[in-house]
Amino acid sequence: MFSAIQAGCTGIEADIWAFGDDLYVGHSITSLTRNRTLENLYIKPLLDILDKMNVPPQIVEDSHPSLHGIFDTEPSQSMVFMIDFKTYGPTTWPAMYSALEPLRQKGYLTHVKNGTIVHRPLIVVGTGNTPFDHVTSSEHNPHHDVFFDAPLDLMYLGADNETSAPAARDLRPRSLEEPRDTSSIHTEDEFDNPTDPDAYTPLNSYYASTSFSKAIGHLFRGEINETQLELIRGQIRGAQRRGLKARFWETPFWPIGLRNHVWDELVKEGVDYLNVDDLKGATQRDWSDWRGWWSRGMKVHQVNDDGW
């Protein structure tokens, strides 16, 4: 987490596993240890950073104090704190919601009040097995301070507002499809989440995300073809028209040239957040050609983060 903050990332992610009342952090069940809890790796460090950023002024009294975020040079910039539910959503939710209480009590969580978004230093977004009906429920989310990671692949909107997306996978021989790990891909059959893209609004969702490899398909000869580009544009367009932040995960990570090519194309097409696990590679890129994208807030979401 600290390396992500130091690099200027405005999004961090924790994979959580619920066992009893405890929430453990790790990429797989075999990586879990007793001290690697959500509280130890994320809640307490975030609370400590934000408390230090919000010490009352000692010289001149601020008559209109506002909460400062994590970044000293950009105090109004919120940090997205994505929580990826790895265990069953409805039983994981209570422990997760309770774990946020110290941050909630300090007023650090962005929330919805009377139909209006109240911006605060942190934006909590549930993904993975997070149940959408809990996010939208006043019973389960009474403070309305946990948002959803909406399905970007449902958001396609063409330039002429058509909603029927082109099928990128149909443009290549079946023999070119490569086997891939699908264990982290959640389908609508697994969770009773809405298939109507208009169900996801800024009042219940923040990101709209999808697997790049699943939604866009194989990159033949390392190139994004025109149909795939139209899919990317349409999904980004549809998310942004609905007030959500477009994000692709599971982008190619090797070879480096292909990874950089995909990053460039996504930024060029207006993606809101770039999903990275190579912080050094992302921060060393020259983003000046892309409309000041990097300097507009460093919209990088770090994945594969174990908290430190």
Named regions from a protein language model:
Residues 1-16, 22:
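General structural concept
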Residues 6, 21-308:
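Catalytic cores of phosphodiester-bond hydrolases, prominently lipid phosphodiesterases
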